[in-house]
Amino acid sequence: MQQALTLARSAASIGEVPIAALLVRDGIVIAEAHNLRETKQDPTAHAEVIAIREGARQTNSWRLIDTTLYVTLEPCTMCIGAIVLARIPRLVFGATDPKAGACGSIMNIPPEPRLNHRVEVVEGVCAEDSQALLQDFFRRLRRESAQRETP
């Protein structure tokens, strides 16, 4: 998760929301990504989706069995949907997301019995660091916005 936090910091340095994901198989990172939504002007350019796409390319398979996805923030509905569809068996995330989290915060998709795949979820790993990174980023954005608006 420390590696994901480092990657999230690099996202913040280019004006992206500091969220990052690492896809790991047998202890080796096979894909990593941070959010690129602002850079690409693409609403689907979340760290999880980008890492899953890269993992599928690296393994030449959309079935990412025997992997773990590490994410600095609780995935949204789109991202947990991609995780389920990619058959990723394990998700580890840092901070919870009370506004958009779909792994227990506003809804809880992973244990949904009607889905054809279940994801084991471990939450709260480096949660304080993940949350602090996000809070600092948005605090800085608000401060910069206020400075631009001040005549």
Set out the residue ranges of the language-model regions.
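Helix-adjacent hinge/juxtasegments
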Residues: 41, 52-82, 86
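Short beta->alpha transition motifs characteristic of CBS
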Residues: 30-37
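Small-residue (primarily alanine) positions within well-ordered alpha-helices
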Residues: 4, 8-11, 21, 31, ...
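A short, polar/charged loop-to-alpha-helix boundary motif
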Residues: 39-49
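Short beta-strand scaffold segments in enzyme catalytic cores
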Residues: 19-27
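Short, basic and Ser/Thr-rich N-terminal targeting/leader segments
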Residues: 15-19, 63-65
